[in-house]
Design a protein with these regions (language model features):
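S-adenosylmethionine/decaboxylated-SAM
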Residues: 58-60, 65-248
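Membrane-proximal basic amphipathic "stem/tether" segments
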Residues: 1-63, 248
Length: 248
C-alpha cells in the first residue's frame, strides 16, 4: 500500500508518524529485512583471528545499517575491518581521501598508534552544504580529539583531484571521497597507487548494498578495472567496503 503513495515525501511522513506512535511496529517490519539469521554459525569473521579474539573480530555479532550510523558513515563491520587490518598489518603510513565528522580518521590513527602518520584529505564543502553555514566545525573537533592522544595526522582541506602533497609510498589508502566514476578514478590513480606492494587500497561503496544502495556502478567499476589490470587483487568485501592488495 505504501508503495502506491503519491510521493516519497508522503511515504516518509507516514513512516515517521507510525514510528512516533509505536516504534516497535516499524522495527518489527524492517528488522527481519535487515538482519541475517542471527546464529553464530552464520556470523562473519571478516579478519582471520590471531592471538585469540579481539573486539574487531566480534563485529559480526552486530547488525549495522545506516539506521545506526553516528560519527562515522560506515557499518560496524566496515570500521572494525579497517581498524583490525591497519593494526594487524603494522601499517604506519596511510592516506584517507574523504573526511566528514572524523570517524574513520580517528579509527585509522588509533589503529596505527605511536609512530603512525596519516594524511587525511577532504575538499571541505559538505559541512557548509549540509548544515547551511550553522557554524559546526567538525575538523576542529577532530583535531582536538587527535591531539588528545598525540596522533600524527595532517587534516588537509583541498581538492584531491589537483592537490599536491608529498607522502612517499604508504601502507594503506582509504578512498571515500567523490563517488562519481571520474572522481573515484582520479583518487585511485593519484593516491591509491601510492600504496606499496603488499599494502592495502580500501574502496568504500564499491560493493553493492541491495537495500540502502552504494556506488557500485561507479566505485565498483573502478575496482573492477583495477582488478582487470592486474596491479591489485581483491582480498575481501565487507558490506560496502572492498579491500584490494597491491600485488605489483
Amino acid at each position: 500500500m505504501l508503495g502506491r503513495a503519491p510521493s516519497k515525501t508522503l511515504q516518509t511522513e507516514v513512516v515517521r508518524t507510525v514510528f512516533k506512535a509505536d516504534p516497535k511496529i516499524v522495527l518489527a517490519a524492517v528488522g527481519p529485512e535487515l538482519n541475517r539469521e542471527p546464529t553464530l554459525s552464520r556470523m562473519p569473521l571478516d579478519l582471520e583471528p590471531v592471538d585469540g579474539l579481539h573486539f574487531e573480530d566480534l563485529a559480526g555479532l552486530f547488525v549495522s545499517t545506516p539506521f545506526n550510523h553516528g560519527i562515522v558513515g560506515m557499518t560496524i563491520r566496515q570500521v572494525a575491518y579497517i581498524f583490525g587490518l591497519t593494526r594487524r598489518s603494522g601499517a604506519k603510513r596511510a592516506i584517507e581521501i574523504g573526511r566528514w565528522r572524523g570517524g574513520t580518521t580517528v579509527a585509522l590513527a588509533g589503529a596505527m598508534g605511536d609512530g603512525g602518520k596519516l594524511w587525511s584529505i577532504d575538499v571541505g564543502e559538505k559541512e557548509a552544504r549540509v548544515f547551511h553555514g550553522r557554524g559546526l566545525k567538525f575538523d576542529e573537533e577532530t583535531r582536538e580529539f587527535l591531539d588528545r592522544f598525540g596522533f600524527d595526522v595532517e587534516l588537509i582541506v583541498g581538492d584531491s583531484r589537483t592537490l599536491e602533497v608529498e607522502t612517499g609510498e604508504v601502507d594503506l589508502v582509504l578512498v571515500d571521497g567523490d563517488h562519481t566514476y571520474e572522481g573515484v578514478k582520479i583518487d585511485v590513480e593519484r593516491w591509491g597507487r601510492r600504496v606499496r606492494v603488499g599494502g592495502a587500497l580500501l574502496l568504500d561503496d564499491a560493493v553493492d548494498e541491495p537495500i540502502f544502495g552504494s556506488h557500485a556502478e561507479t566505485a565498483g567499476r573502478v575496482m573492477q578495472e583495477l582488478l582487470d589490470e592486474g596491479d591489485f587483487a581483491l582480498r575481501a568485501q565487507v558490506d560496502r567496503l572492498a579491500h584490494l592488495e597491491r600485488v605489483r
